[in-house]
Structure formats: structure tokens, C-alpha cells
Amino acid sequence: MRIVGWLLTISLVFWIGVASAANKVTVGLTSLSPSAMPIYVAKEKGFFEAEGLEIQIPVFRSGTENTQAVIAGEVQIAFGSVTEVFNLKKAKLDGRYFWGISNFMPFRLYAHPSIKSAQDLKGKKLAISNFGAQSDYLTQFTLRHFGVEPIKEAAILPIGSTPARYAALKSGRVDATIMWFPETLRAEQDGFKMLVDLNDIIPDWGYLGYYARSDYLKNHRETVIRYLRAHTRGVREVKSNPQAGIEMLKKYLKFDQAIAEAGYKEFVKSFAEDGRLPVKGFEFLLAEEMKSGEVKDKFTVADLIDESFVQFLRSSR
């Protein structure tokens, strides 16, 4: 009987250890963006804990670094852009974008006031966060859209985060960069010229959403569903309680009151409770990647997304 009891104790300890590991989720953030409001609100309000989850939220300097952490298995769920799923494909790893968070285009291209149009960027230097990141793709696409060949006709420099890129623009180290709030607001105040609002040239963009390795989505489906339930509660809380979102922006992004209020107003309208995936944006991106030769293997949008979580949570309401 003692042996049986000992075995039962060992089995229980092992089961608790496995269950505990399964309930720990590392959610990698490509950057500290106002789009992360629902995540931080859900964590602060205990919504993840209510679903039996222990969440860690490391912040990376670029989408490229976030993707590398996903590939290494250090991050289970990534909060990033549609372009990062392409990086998984390029690494010959099967990954899926499975939940839309902010389906809009917040980026604008700003330049030194002496530069009057995007065509004038020939021979100039542009800052990105890192090669392979969303800022890299959008910068190169925008240049080509206006007849400027990146690398050959305009230098692309990996500088880092949006604040770092804006600092490089202000110091004269670069001539232009794409940015999002609040640096766009600061650029306007400092007299820099907006050359392009990327909303005008790119449709239905998946600015930020969740993606993961396909094997994780398959083997930990219930964990992902519980995570998304908590995230959705966070979205509802942010929408119904503006002060909760504003306080998160002040605490984690270090915004002052005025910037936090402006950031809340700009981003809250982009949050989708149903996790809608920006299929048109994926189709657009895939076509451009194929055209540029960046993607060698043939695949479709269906190879990049997993709509089953959106469909399941929609039907279970």
C-alpha cells in the first residue's frame, strides 16, 4: 500500500507539473504599441488568471527578433504583424496568424522638410527597425510604389524602434522614416513633412495580431482558446472603460495624459472583439512578396492563417 501511495503521489506531482507548464504562456510583443492595451488591461484585471493562465509579456525591439523567439520556442504566442508570418515561412517553419487585433494602417512616411515628395527620396537614407520587420517591408513597398528602387536608389538603415528612428530623423542621420503614433504627432509638431499616409496605398492591413507555430496551435488549442477569451474581455474593458486603456498607456508606454488620451482615441476604434483576420491585406502582401521575389515557395493565404479560432469563439458566444 505504501508503494501504491508513493506512486500516486509521484503521479500527482508529475501531473501538477505538466499542467502548470501547460498553463504558462509567453506572449512576445514586437513593440510597445497602443494596440497592446487589451493585453495589459486583461493582465492587470486578472482576466488571464481567471482562465487559469500565467502570462509573461517580453517586449522585443523588432518583429524580426520576435519571430526568432517564436522559432526558438521561447515565445508561444506572438503579438506582431502579418509580415512576421512570412518570416516563419522563409525559415521553413509552419506558422499561422490566427487572431486580428488592430486591422488598420497606422504608419505614415515622414521626411526632412526639404524633401517635397516620395519621388525625391532617390539618393536618400531611410530608417527601418530591422531587416525583415514590418517597417522594412512597408518602407520598401512604399518606395517601389513611387518609383524608387530600395537599396539601389535609396539606402535602408536598420535603426530600431519608432522612437529611435524618429531620433535619427531629427539628428539628420537619416532623411526619412515610416512612423506611427505618437511619433507622428511629434513629427507634425516639429515641422517634419508627411510624404505618404500608407492608408492611401495599402488596404485592410493587419497591423498587429496574434500568430504562433502551427504545432503549438494544434497541441495547445484549449490554452489558446482560454487566452483569447481573456484577451476579448480585455478588448471589451478597454472599449467600455476608456480610463483603463489610458492608464495602461501611461504606465507601460510612459505617455503623458494628453498623449495617452490621443493614443486611446486613435487606436481603440481598430480593436476587433471577434478577431477578424485581414484576408485582403494578406492577399495584397502575398502578391507583393511574390512579385518582389522575396518568397520562393508557392503558397496561398490559406497557408498563412488559421481561422478556426475566430470561427469557434464566434459560434460559442
Feature annotation, model-predicted:
Residues 1-2:
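N-terminal secretory signal peptides that target proteins for export/translocation
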Residues 287-317:
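Conserved C-terminal helix/tail region of periplasmic/extracytoplasmic solute-binding proteins
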Residues 19-21:
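Boundary at the C-terminal end of the N-terminal hydrophobic targeting segment
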Residues 218-296:
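Secondary-structure end/capping motifs
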Residues 5-17:
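Bacterial N-terminal signal peptides
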Residues 83-84, 161-253:
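Pocket-lining segment of extracytoplasmic ligand-binding domains
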Residues 23-171, 175-181, 194-198, 203-204:
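Short, glycine-/small- and polar/acidic-enriched structural segments
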